[in-house]
Curated annotation (Swiss-Prot):
L-aspartate binds at K139, R221, R283. It is an enzyme of class 2 (transferase). Its EC number is 2.1.3.2. This is Aspartate carbamoyltransferase, chloroplastic. The gene is PYRB. It comes from Oryza sativa subsp. japonica (Rice).
Amino acid sequence: MAAARATLPLPRVPAPSPRPQLRPFPSLPARRGAVACGAGSAAAGVAASLRLGDVIEAQQFDRDALTEIFEVAREMEALERGSSSRGAGRSRVLEGYLMATLFYEPSTRTRLSFEAAMRRLGGEVLTTENAREFSSAAKGETLEDTIRTVEGYSDIIVLRHFESGAARRAAATADIPVINAGDGPGQHPTQALLDVYSIEREIGTLDGIKLGLVGDLANGRTVRSLAYLIAKYQNIKIYFVSPDVVKMKDDIKEYLTSQGVEWEESSDLLEVASKCDVIYQTRIQKERFGERIDLYEAARGKYIVDKKVLDVLPKHAVIMHPLPRLDEITIDVDSDPRAAYFRQAKNGLYIRMALLKLLLVGR
């Protein structure tokens, strides 16, 4: 007769430690128990259900919040500069936390910098690249169902989507923080945060600057978010330089006017460059033109930052670009010390480290 098999007791699983109370960012209404903004309005219902702590749009930040984010970003930069290539000296503040990245559109800098930021703070990453083709979205699953599923695996979601407003829908659905990493031609708030942070680092101030936004201003979510965010500062002047088919939309112009921000449209890049502290160049976004390739070809190449622009640009000024670059900034500009776009991209790591820390564990 076979001997009875001994049974081993299962090890006890320790209870998870309670999550710290998050310090909410201002201006977005609370997710639970919020008062509806307007009866019978679906959009108002979505807006009312947003929880403090989501990063959805540039308008949600006031100057106090920006100051705090930038202070933490400087701490993250100092931390990174003081750590070794093998990780010695790095923070483990997000150890035990898991970030999910859901990217329905291509990304290099945003996705990789978020993933690097999470890992450099000790956290882990679940990643979905090309989610439009290689996730259940290809089978027809709704964004809301995807968010409800993914939030069960993670502590925070970073979402890039091809539809404007998708991040709001995700935030209204999820019970964990959602970060908008770009929603179609809508907004890209974390890019705006790193852009404004970069301007402060490069120029030394934010109040009183003159900013030239150049290129695809109709489809570029980065310029929209930057315009919203820079309006928080005093005595700003913005120049819009773009081909006729991709001019800045009226909603941004109306918002700037309502905030007392002076703006001007111009067709002369050289004249604008001679007046500006920052030239913010963008590519013409072919993917937004659909079948109207003729309009894309007409717009592409009209405004290029090259040696002629450098010759009139003030010595203290900088050239920025959200990247990727095509041919709208010539390669020979890269060696000029005023070319700040790669320093700008590096700042994205520090800003995103700061956001993850503030959203998940607080200051």
